[in-house]
Amino acid sequence: MIFFNFKLNRMICPIFFLYIINVLFTQYFIKCEGNKVTVISHNNGHNDNLDVNKNGVISQENVFDTSESLNLPSNKKVGSDDLNTTTISFTVPDNLENEVKVVSSSESGKGATVSHTKVTSEGLSDTQPNVTQSVSSSTHTPGSLDSTMSTEQHSSVSQSSLPTESSSETLNKATVPEIPIQINSGLLKNYNGVKVTGSCGSYFRVYLVPHILIYALTKYSVIQLESLFNDNARIDVEHKGELQNKCSEGYHFKLVVYITHNVLNLKWKTYKPNEESKSEDSDVRKYRIPKLERPFTSIQVYTANSKAGVIETKNYNIRTDIPDTCDAIATDCFLNGNVNIEKCFQCTLLVQKKDKSHECFKYVSSEMKKKMNEIKVKAQDDFNPNEYKLIESIDNILSKIYKKANKPFEISKDLINLEDLDYQFKNELLEYCKLLKKVDTSGTLEEYELGNAEDIYNNLTRLLKSHSDENIVTLQGKLRNTAICIKNVDEWILNKRGLTLPSESPSESSSKSDSYLNTFNDKDKNEDKDDMSKNSKEEFKNDDKENSDDQNNNDSNKKDDENNINNGDTNYVYDFDDDDYDNNSYEKDMYESPIKENKNGVIDLEKYGNQIKLKSPYFKNSKYCNYEYCNRWRDKTSCISQIEVEEQGNCGLCWIFASKLHFETIRCMRGYGHFRSSALYVANCSKRKPIDRCEEGSNPLEFLRILDEKKFLPLESNYPYSYTSAGNSCPKLPNSWTNLWGDTKLLFNKKVHRYIGNKGFISHETSYFKNNMDLFIDMVKREVQNKGSVIIYIKTQDVIGYDFNGKGVHSMCGDRTPDHAANIIGYGNYINKKGEKRSYWLIRNSWSYYWGDEGNFRVDMLGPKNCLYNFIHTVVFFKLDLGTIHVPKKKSWKKNVYFLRHNTDFMYSLYYNNYEPETSQDFESENDYDNAFVHGQSDESDETNKEGKNVHNSVEKKIQILHILKHIKDSQIKRGLVKYDNINETKDEHTCSRVNSQDAEKYEECKKFCLTKWNECKDHYSPGYCLTDLYKGEDCNFCYV
């Protein structure tokens, strides 16, 4: 027996010794495979795959966020056809508050305990996270109430050593950023819902994909719901009554969101740390959700840390309603930061050369299927030979105009001197202008004398100095500005200014056009009264009638040249003006009226949306246009986005182009669709002498007078614009021409205020609002939301020229006498170089697409403190009754919409609302919330003086951002990271920062190729596919751009 034991011991000891070695050496076994570093942890059966992404940042895949035993799936690439996906089923828990979570991924600050992976760092920047990684093991400590059994990923960043904004360091190291976001979120174990906890003062969003968005501005204890299935109707949780739980400094909050029996439940609670059980009962709100064609598929939580320069998106998968293969492609697009998952999904199918019979094509839009053959044609095949040559010439000039051309383009910003121009480069400049003249359709270079090589060099370098921070994509577009080739470039702008102010009253009017529209008699009054009475009786008999913000340009919307028959597939639109509102309370009128709940305390979201629609059918709180942000041109499916930038040429007809754009946006908002109207018709039907039409200015009053007298406005295609023809006689009207004016009537404003009121026309001078600019801003926002745009009068002389940089935000003063008419088409928020939160107007000019930022520019709403006049001298809007038309009915939800798509400002506003200025305020009262989105004046004005001279530099701060994305499914986390050199890139539907390379060393090459070739592919239906086709290699993936 002893012998047996001895032999057994001799056998067991080596085995035990080998087991100990195996445990020690395989605790963290690192496997290198290409650019992927896989860290396999055998602690408790967890497998952490750390992928070095395109920026050199390690991302973790297959991190199991639970302490339960799990069957590990085999490692597969995202997008592989055999990736397994399962559906989680949910039941209602008996006690929701004590329910254990399956998944919790939280960032709770420095010093938090972690399990399996602990990452520490030194340093923090306002703009850029960049920390090194260390790996260790630790044991998770469960909390008390609502504690989880899950493994949690905690984050922390200290505040010292991250590179500053001006630092040359980037995120090209293998790093895992630590996120001091004080928001924790987790998926409820047996329920369709999440719990979000954190410190009061943060701003976050919860998205129940694809139907409901929840906004939480905890600093003001404001929680709002937006129902995406019902025209984006937004409701405040305090509709039912004031919240009992209020956030204060030092308090924490808890928000529980879950769905049961088609009812959305919200539970909100605030408490002092470690005193949650002692705090008051939670505020509870319930909302009934209508039966929807598509179920809820995931819950997303969006958070941001402005100091660390981090935005985080977590996607908790609760249901998969598409095949695993297709879901894997969509997940891959999500993890690479794509804002339009459908386009990325389509591009991936094309690049992978999937057959049309493939199951994933069921989830592709019908529009894409129709354009399949078009997509497979290279973008440049549509170019004429001169376009090829011009593109090549621009690239050559940009490669030679900088001294350090041998370095990467973005680093090389030193321009060569005039004496450095050699004979070959001079010829290149001359040839460039000849090509530009051939492809230019505005006729500008036909009118002006072309400059010599020295003139062109001076004009070009002046423009490049004004755009020193822009990338090659922007500069390629700027070099299509024809002004660069003019000998005396300052003459380019002289005839583009053409505004004269109207008189303030009929008695002071020296112009027939002024007095004509001031005439308002009892007959007009009675007609308007009858029309309004008729409209109010018949308006919106059908609840399905839709606002035209989402209306496509569709021939069925024509009034005169199309035969629309009401066969049950269309609704009537009865148009009337909707301007009679109290500027101080219109938001309250629209969104804060009492809402009835049923006996169980449940509010019906569908009924509420219909109620809002009936209150103001044209006032739509769209995700592309709301009180905080508005840019309908970003929504490529909208009617307004089809309105192109105009080029008035060498003629002072800015007043016509500003007026016609305003008229066209009103038509879009009223459901008439977009049909480009003829500016030349208005110009040539003016009663002024032909020789004066381009040289003497006018204003929107004359625009209305001409059309009201003629009762006709043809299409642009009927009577095309050429500024050289703006001296001809008023044309005779062929029967084949379309009349866009139709039955339009001018209405008279009945409210008394500080404005110039004319028939069909109202104007407000900012000087009257000097002590109450918030009222002015509210009024303008209202009009832009309601009518799509407003007309503005501004001063451009010695302020705005051909080289004006429209990319940034300018803080400029105005002048007593404006000289130019343009349009405000949107607005938004930004952070200036001093770290102050500010707001801007988005302005559309009529100086061509290649001027400013694709024809637009942004201006601070309030401007510098020392201004005598605001940059916006006057705002003008029309009051029109357009009559009635037929518009197609639209279903509440498209069956082929399967993928996430936010508006382009979604990430920026998330960051902005979490941003705390350096002169941060303490917790404000709830009454301060009303002014939270319009921010005051600062001393910052760059090169601005009281008269507003020569402003070129942007006052907007450049902020680098790291976007961390987490996809949580079956208790498994997959991560993606995208770095943006400027947070404004998150506003772009496409950006080369999202290119991907299997070889990390090839990332910069892929990004540079994308930037260089972008202008060739940007108008292609699938730019990612176009870039892939041009690249020909296999190292780059462009579908994520």
Curated annotation (Swiss-Prot):
Post-translational modification: Just prior to merozoite egress from host erythrocytes, proteolytically cleaved by SUB1 to generate the active 75kDa form.
Biased composition, class Polar residues, residue ranges: 114-149
Pfam families attached to this UniProt entry: Peptidase_C1
Family: Belongs to the peptidase C1 family.
Glycosylation, residue list: N84, N130, N459, N554, N583, N684, N984
One GO-annotated biological process of the protein: proteolysis
Matching SMART domains: Pept_C1
PROSITE patterns per UniProt: THIOL_PROTEASE_CYS (PS00139)
Listed Basic and acidic residues bias regions: 521-545
Site (Cleavage): S105, S106, Q380, D381, Q937, S938
UniProt protein name: Serine-repeat antigen protein 6
Phenotype for C654A: No viable blood stage parasites
Species in which this protein is naturally found: Plasmodium falciparum
Cellular localization per UniProt: Parasitophorous vacuole lumen; Parasitophorous vacuole membrane
Annotated GO CC locations: membrane; symbiont-containing vacuole membrane
Keyword hit for Protease: yes
Any GO molecular function: cysteine-type peptidase activity
Gene3D superfamilies to which the protein is assigned, alphabetical: Cysteine proteinases
PANTHER family the record matches: CYSTEINE PROTEASE FAMILY C1-RELATED
Topology in the lipid bilayer: Peripheral membrane protein
EC code(s) of this entry: 3.4.22.-
Keyword tags: Glycoprotein, Hydrolase, Membrane, Protease, Signal, Thiol protease, Zymogen
